[in-house]
Amino acid sequence: MAHDVRADFPRSQELLICRLHRGPFSSAIMRLRLPLLACVVLVFSLGLRLPAAETHAATRAAFLKLLDRPRVPLAAEVGTTSELKEELVEIAFSYAAEAGQRVPGIIVKPTSSSASSPSSAYVRRPVVIVLHGTGGNKEGERALLIDYARAGFVGVAIDGRYHGARAKGGKAAKASEYVDAILQTFRTGQEYPFFFDTAWDVMRLIDYLETRDDVDPRRIGAIGFSKGGIELYLAAAADPRIAVAVPCIGVQSFRWATDHDSWQSRIGTVQAAFNAAAQDSGVTNPGADFVRTFYARVAPGIDAAFDGPAMLPLIAPRPLLAINGEIDARTPMPGLKLCAEAARSAYHTAGADNKFVLRVQPNTGHKVNPDSMVAAREWLVRWLQP
């Protein structure tokens, strides 16, 4: 049976609280009786020096606690199967991520038999999960799924929250319902469609994939683009079942961007929600201070305890290839360097220097070049061995 990372909540919380209680801020913390997330934010804000392993365990536990919600049966359903060219097949499926949230997906894979075991009913293959960006959908990743299936993988894509079939307006809605949902989160504090909920959906997707007899659960990798890249590194930091991760044009430091007046491009992806939230709050000409308020409501900790430099080290020692554009305003280079420094330190400590690579595309903005797509595929093939 796979290890349930959510079971680590109590032990990790105990480790962090005990360490803080023995430190110079112990009396204040004991009086405040801070919950786990607040303790992790306090550590981050005050720059308290804890052993890396304890900090990482506490950060993961706090993030999992933030994501956690009542468990429901997967209630997985397999829909239509379509034969594709080159002995590939496409399978529609869905599963329950939580109450009221069914996640539709598609699988593209080679036909079950193989030259090495032609009589086998099923061949367990490695998986590549593909996560789309803002305004995208699972069907938009079909060509990439086919490419990975040709290489011997089971390619899987799902619709993110309020995207594709999960938007009332369907594909035509693009990102409008997603942006409106983020505004509703700001107003009500319910749901976290800005990255966090889809990270949870990915973890539940892995729960589903583990039930399939054509999947090798020890070899599950993922690639994500922009919003999907952020969701991927968050999910990989939280869930060690993601064996290999390739976040593309997503790795960043939200905090650095906010502190250095470089937040506009990232906020621009949800501009309508941000503007309406500022209007609700009576804020004209919103700046960095309101950006922090906005993030705290729609994705608590994304610019603090769960920022890129805090989350990437949690992926070590699993193979991690981050692909970014040198002049991408959504992932400013100085903040990206902070993420890379934190990751390199963690991978070095783990004795896995060769398992972290930052690929910076020269003179490139918010896109992934063809040569980087080749590099991503080679990375997944290298470590997942289809």
Model-derived segments and their meaning:
Residues 277, 286, 340-386:
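C-terminal catalytic histidine-bearing segment of alpha/beta-hydrolase fold enzymes
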Residues 322-324:
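Short beta-strand/loop motif that positions the catalytic acidic residue
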Residues 35-49:
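Bacterial N-terminal signal peptides
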Residues 327-331, 365-367:
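Acidic catalytic loop of the alpha/beta-hydrolase fold
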Residues 69-113:
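N-terminal cap/lid segment of alpha/beta-hydrolase-fold proteins
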Residues 244-311, 332, 336-341, 346-353:
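Mobile cap/lid helix-loop segments that gate and shape the active-site cleft of serine hydrolases
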Residues 203-269, 300-303:
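Primarily recognizes the serine-hydrolase "nucleophile elbow" in alpha/beta-hydrolase
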Residues 123-124, 129, 133-200, 254-261:
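Cap/lid segment of the alpha/beta-hydrolase catalytic domain
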